[in-house]
Amino acid sequence: MPTRSTNPNKQPVELNRTSLFLGLLLVFVLGILFSSYFFN
């Protein structure tokens, strides 16, 4: 991470974007698992 010392304001934005993406991916996977579980 070479841009951490030069751009301290860019790191939290990327972390929030990554956490948001992981959260949406987790909800998407859980939705698929629950839908397949209920349809079976």
UniProtKB/Swiss-Prot annotation:
Keywords: Membrane, Photosynthesis, Photosystem II, Reaction center, Thylakoid, Transmembrane, Transmembrane helix. The keyword rRNA-binding does not apply. It is found in: Cellular thylakoid membrane. One of its GO terms (biological process) is photosynthesis. It comes from the Bacteria. It is a single-pass membrane protein. The chain crosses the membrane at residues 19-39. GO terms for cellular component: photosystem II reaction center; plasma membrane-derived thylakoid membrane. Its main location: membrane. Pfam families: PsbL (PF02419). PSII is composed of 1 copy each of membrane proteins PsbA, PsbB, PsbC, PsbD, PsbE, PsbF, PsbH, PsbI, PsbJ, PsbK, PsbL, PsbM, PsbT, PsbX, PsbY, PsbZ, Psb30/Ycf12, peripheral proteins PsbO, CyanoQ (PsbQ), PsbU, PsbV and a large number of cofactors. It forms dimeric complexes. One of the components of the core complex of photosystem II (PSII). PSII is a light-driven water:plastoquinone oxidoreductase that uses light energy to abstract electrons from H(2)O, generating O(2) and a proton gradient subsequently used for ATP formation. It consists of a core antenna complex that captures photons, and an electron transfer chain that converts photonic excitation into a charge separation. This subunit is found at the monomer-monomer interface and is required for correct PSII assembly and/or dimerization. NCBIfam families: PRK00753.1 (NF001972). Belongs to the PsbL family. This is Photosystem II reaction center protein L. It comes from Synechococcus elongatus (strain ATCC 33912 / PCC 7942 / FACHB-805).
